Every structure is written in structure tokens, then in C-alpha cells.
Swiss-Prot record:
Source organism per UniProt: Escherichia coli (strain K12)
Protein name: Aspartate 1-decarboxylase
Quaternary state and interactors: Heterooctamer of four alpha and four beta subunits. Interacts with PanZ.
Keyword Lipoprotein included in the entry's annotation: no
Cofactor binding summary note: Binds 1 pyruvoyl group covalently per subunit.
Gene Ontology terms: cellular component: cytosol
EC number(s) given by UniProt: 4.1.1.11
GO terms for biological process, alphabetical: alanine biosynthetic process; pantothenate biosynthetic process; protein autoprocessing
Modulation of this protein's activity: Inhibited by hydroxylamine, sodium borohydride, D-cycloserine, hydrazine, semicarbazine and succinic dehydrazine. D-serine is a competitive inhibitor. Cleavage and catalytic activity are regulated by PanZ in a coenzyme A (CoA)-dependent fashion.
The keyword RNA-binding belongs to this UniProt entry's keyword annotation: no
Chain positions found as Pyruvic acid (Ser): 25
Similarity remark: Belongs to the PanD family.
Sequence positions that bind substrate: 57, 73-75
Length: 126
């Protein structure tokens, strides 16, 4: 059996730009891409915490250290500057590998300040 697993996640980054007329994609600070293990041109899902919209696009690199999250093209209708979003990528793998897989997660606060990284998502408690 093949399973689709979370590969990497940027948790609660803030949109810094939204450019309707750029040709598409989401530009992401290269440091952030590295932290989540997301590659340039990789498919990503974006979940907008602020407005509830969910959409897919692909990642492109923004300048390292810039803290840029720029939602571009038609996707700019789904996010505005200042919105808080979660950006995720996924990977497929055999069931036996999936059972021990741990995703790359980066957590953010404020103006895209990376607070920590982890190889797991905490267990949710009531």
C-alpha cells in the first residue's frame, strides 16, 4: 500500500505580498523552504487561517532572510497581506516507511519570525 504523508509544513506564516498579476505560485523565503524541506517548484497546499480558504499552487524561492510569503496569480484572490496561513507539502511512500515517517515542521510568530522546528506534530489534548 502507498500512503500520502505530510512532508513539510510552515505553521502560521504571515502573507507579506499578494500579486494578482504575477504568473502564479507562492514565493517563500529560502530559509523557510529549507526548514520545511520544500523544494522550489514543488506542489504545495495553502490553508488560510484568517479566512478559511484552502488552495493549491507551487513554491518558488524568495530571497533568503527576507521573510517573504507572496501569494501570486489567481491564488492572490484567496489571501491578503497580513493573513495567517499554513503551507504544506506531501510525499507518497510505502506503508512500512510511512509508519516511522516524521515531517519537517517550522513554527512562526509575529512578522514571520521562525520560533522553532520539529520532526513531529504535538499530540492534541482536550
Amino acid at each position: 500500500m502507498i500512503r500520502t504523508m505530510l512532508q513539510g509544513k510552515l505553521h502560521r506564516v504571515k502573507v507579506t505580498h499578494a500579486d494578482l498579476h504575477y504568473e502564479g505560485s507562492c514565493a517563500i523565503d529560502q530559509d523557510f523552504l529549507d526548514a520545511a524541506g520544500i523544494l522550489e517548484n514543488e506542489a504545495i497546499d495553502i490553508w488560510n487561517v484568517t479566512n478559511g480558504k484552502r488552495f493549491s499552487t507551487y513554491a518558488i524561492a524568495a530571497e533568503r532572510g527576507s521573510r517573504i510569503i507572496s501569494v501570486n496569480g489567481a491564488a492572490a484572490h484567496c489571501a491578503s497581506v497580513g493573513d495567517i496561513v499554513i503551507i504544506a507539502s506531501f510525499v507518497t511512500m510505502p506503508d512500512e516507511e510511512a509508519r516511522t515517517w516524521r515531517p519537517n515542521v517550522a513554527y512562526f510568530e509575529g512578522d514571520n519570525e521562525m520560533k522553532r522546528t520539529a520532526k513531529a506534530i504535538p499530540v492534541q489534548v482536550a
